[in-house]
């Protein structure tokens, strides 16, 4: 047995999955920089737009969004699981007690062989699994990494809710602005049509001019219902993100207030590795990979012996035939071990499954990193082109 234990302890573990390609993707990424390279990420990024309505909507979404609240409950669940797994590292202590009163009902002459007894017993039980090969520690580490991944996922849910509220709010303001512009244009068309009809009555315009003016008015009026629908549906989507029913109006989205689009502040992206490190989904994937690695260590430790320490300390008060005896103290200390010898390959299959899950998690992490690089690059390119388009439109209007 000692030879088996020493050989198992000296065995070198597998180095785990190869994530060098994912790390290289972070290190070699060269994002196109827009503006300054400096600056750290502001968690209250929406405040840079200086829009109190947007700030109020984002704050409410972070508190009331259902996805955010669901993620928060998962964090509580994962933390409870982490606490439960860590408890395996500590000994257990229990208090036991019992009282018994046994009467035979026989005459006193026969009570020598069947005496009446009354007993009071109390004891302390101590149990501890000595974590020689780290199975309990690996289980606790896996649960702790799961809790960290849940916390990162919750942060990602808050970030997603905030960004979606901001995007929909800007879309709502833009739709209202286009609606206002079309309504002003429609009023101008109506005035023009009335003027042309008046000129026709005076013989200064033809029926063709009237028909053309009416067609232009109707064409412009036909574009208003889709814009009004867009304003309404966008407001409904914002209500849903805030955990409200679409039938409940949002006082903050007051259509009587003139629409406006805020100025887009400069958003310095920072360094590539810093940009990716800000993403909660990547941090969650990395923590999940660490959890799977801990489960591999746990599965390998299950192939090795397990050692247990048990102790019992107690006291007993005994009365026999109404005669009290002296209190008795007793104790029992035992050291035990168990080692799997044959289980039809169950433990080895569990190790293989954990190893495969770790490799799959490493691939998912690599895919998430590469996808994040693409998303950031695409966003920066789109931002640069939209700014160029806005400058070109401003130059065209100034001519």
Residue ranges and their predicted role:
Residues 44, 50-53, 57, 72, ...:
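Small/polar-residue-enriched beta-strand and adjacent coil segments characteristic
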Residues 70-85, 157, 161-193, 198, 220-228, ...:
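Amphipathic alpha-helical coiled-coil segments
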Residues 2-63, 120, 144, 228-277, ...:
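Terminal intrinsically disordered/low-complexity segments used for targeting and assembly
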Residues 206-208:
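Short terminal targeting/anchoring segments
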């Amino acid at each position: 047995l000692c030879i088996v234990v020493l050989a198992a302890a000296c065995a070198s573990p597998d180095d785990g999955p190869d994530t060098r390609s994912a790390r290289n993707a972070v290190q070699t990424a060269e994002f196109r920089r827009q503006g300054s390279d400096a600056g750290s990420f502001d968690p209250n990024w929406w405040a840079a737009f200086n829009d109190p309505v947007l700030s109020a909507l984002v704050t409410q979404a972070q508190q009331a969004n259902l996805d955010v609240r669901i993620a928060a409950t998962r964090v509580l669940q994962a933390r409870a699981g982490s606490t439960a797994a860590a408890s395996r590292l500590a000994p257990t202590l229990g208090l036991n007690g019992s009282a018994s009163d046994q009467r035979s009902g026989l005459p006193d002459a026969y009570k020598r062989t069947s005496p009446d007894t009354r007993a009071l017993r109390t004891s302390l039980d101590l149990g501890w699994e000595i974590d020689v090969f780290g199975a309990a520690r690996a289980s606790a580490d896996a649960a702790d990494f799961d809790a960290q991944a849940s916390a990162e996922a919750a942060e990602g849910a808050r970030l997603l809710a905030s960004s979606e509220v901001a995007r929909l709010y800007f879309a709502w303001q833009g739709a209202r602005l286009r609606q206002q512009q079309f309504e002003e244009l429609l009023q101008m068309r109506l005035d023009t049509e009335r003027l042309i009809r008046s000129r026709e009555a005076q013989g200064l315009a033809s029926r063709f001019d009237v028909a053309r003016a009416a067609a232009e008015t109707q064409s412009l009026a036909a574009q208003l219902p889709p814009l009004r629908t867009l304003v309404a549906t966008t407001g409904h989507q914002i209500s849903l993100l805030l955990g409200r029913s679409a039938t409940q109006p949002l006082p903050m989205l007051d259509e009587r207030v003139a629409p406006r689009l805020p100025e887009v502040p400069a958003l310095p992206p920072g360094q590539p590795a810093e940009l990716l490190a800000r993403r909660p989904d990547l941090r969650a994937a990395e923590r999940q990979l660490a959890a799977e690695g801990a489960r591999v260590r746990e599965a390998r430790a299950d192939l090795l012996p397990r050692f247990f320490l048990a102790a019992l300390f107690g006291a007993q008060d005994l009365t026999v035939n109404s005669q009290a005896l002296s209190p008795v103290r007793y104790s029992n200390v035992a050291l035990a071990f168990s080692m799997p010898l044959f289980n039809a390959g169950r433990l080895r299959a569990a190790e293989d499954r954990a190893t495969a899950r770790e490799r799959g998690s490493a691939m998912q992490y690599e895919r998430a990193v590469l996808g994040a690089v693409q998303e950031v690059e695409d966003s920066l390119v789109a931002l640069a082109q939209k700014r160029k388009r806005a400058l070109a439109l401003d130059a065209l209007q100034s001519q």
